[in-house]
Amino acid sequence: MYRIIRVLTELGVTKIRLTGGEPFVRKDFVGFLEMLSFNDLLEAINITTNGAMISKHIPVLERMDKIKHINLSIDSLQKEKFHQITRRDVFPEVYKTFEDLERSNLNLKLNVVVQQGFNTDEINDFVALTQDKNVTVRFIEEMPFNGKGQRDLKENWNYTRILEEIKTKFDPKPIISEISSTSKNFSIKGHKGTVGIIPAFTRTICGDCNRIRITPVGTFKNCLFDDGVFNIRDFLRNGASNNDLKELFLKLVKEKPANGFIAESNRKKGNVSESMSTIGG
């Protein structure tokens, strides 16, 4: 992975995100972060965690200048519901991780997947956290990456519905975000933090997307909705040089679909059916 990232930075990539589940489950992960920090072409290293194993590493992360943002996945603020959604009985530990990160000098975002029948009644509880905490709460439209294929569209809470729910208790004002931002962001008067909504399923942000993804098994993805366009791991194992890698990346990026609907329609296996744990994120 270090080699892949080095090649990508030589092509102009300046920001990366390392994701889980929980990337800190790898015993060598902190050492890997330290290695990446010496890449002079890399400006920002961001991390997504489920909160299981990051807490003890927070002091080290605070000392790494290139660690910019930590995204904590937390879909409920209620212990029993959290257990039901995640199948992990670790809510007290994850909430303590949230508190530890919020007190640190790291920029913290909470990722909340809005799921019909599970946590839609907690949307404004999450928004309320931003009143006295300098965090960004980002609500994510539920995507079909559940290992079972997508549910009926009528069941999904989309961007508009989520925003309407927030407006029942708060007065969110749009914030101008950078062009490639995945979320539509809002401020609320008197709140230290902000709120964002990621239209991941309705895919209204595709036109500005500049992201690529490499899965845990080495598959290169131009879009979350494609089924993987090339296996980088096998390419490297077959002796590819760094120049070979550069040529490959340039070729693959040129084939990036205009939006997620096109990517999904091009899938060889039909509907999206992987889980996010197999994709990575």
Task: Give residue spans per PLM region.
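Radical SAM/AdoMet-radical enzyme domain recognition
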Residues: 1-18, 25-140
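Glycine-centered flexibility sites
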Residues: 12, 20-21, 51, 76, ...
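Short, well-ordered turn and helix-capping elements at secondary-structure junctions
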Residues: 20, 86, 114, 199-202, ...
